Amino acid sequence: MRRAIFPGTFDPFTIGHYSVVKRALTFMDEVVIGIGINENKKTWFPTEKRVEMIEKLFADDPRVKVDAYDCLTIDFARAKEAQFIVRGIRTVHDFEYEETIADINRKLAGIETILLFTEPELTSISSTIVRELLQFGKDVTPFLPEGMKID
């Protein structure tokens, strides 16, 4: 079985994230969405809420699992018996950062990272932008996967 983890904070999960998962499922048997817990990072939504929102989104697809973790990503990948890490790339800066991390993960754990370039129409969408819009009371529906609601 080809299993990948898709790690991130997902605060919140956007249509860009959704696109990465759907595209990864075209060549993976299973994708585990790993919500990293970082006590030093202030989040808009509690971890449990993010897990719940993403689980609801993929409730009809048994190939997608959702779990939170508070360890190194490579340790989470090992715990989930994943052979791959999937990451989305929006910019050159993202690529340079992810390339370095992918190299370290390969050297430390033998885990390959698959970089998926964002679809052009989604490159400007980020969780940071969505949180800023929420802060000012704006409707963020166009930036969320269909059916996802933010309370």
Swiss-Prot record:
Q: What is its main location?
A: cytoplasm
| Annotated site, Transition state stabilizer, chain positions | H17
Q: Where is this protein found? A: Cytoplasm
Matching Gene3D superfamilies, A to Z?
Answer: HUPs
Q: Which UniProt keywords apply?
A: ATP-binding, Coenzyme A biosynthesis, Cytoplasm, Magnesium, Nucleotide-binding, Nucleotidyltransferase, Transferase
GO MF terms listed in the record are:
ATP binding; pantetheine-phosphate adenylyltransferase activity
Biological processes per GO annotation: coenzyme A biosynthetic process
Q: Which domain of life is it from?
A: Bacteria
Protein's UniProt keywords contain ATP-binding: yes
The record's listing under Pfam families reads: CTP_transf_like (PF01467)
Oligomeric state and interaction partners are given as: Homohexamer.
Q: Which PANTHER family match?
A: PHOSPHOPANTETHEINE ADENYLYLTRANSFERASE (PTHR21342:SF1)
Report the family membership: Belongs to the bacterial CoaD family.
Its biological purpose is as follows: Reversibly transfers an adenylyl group from ATP to 4'-phosphopantetheine, yielding dephospho-CoA (dPCoA) and pyrophosphate.
Q: What is this protein called?
A: Phosphopantetheine adenylyltransferase
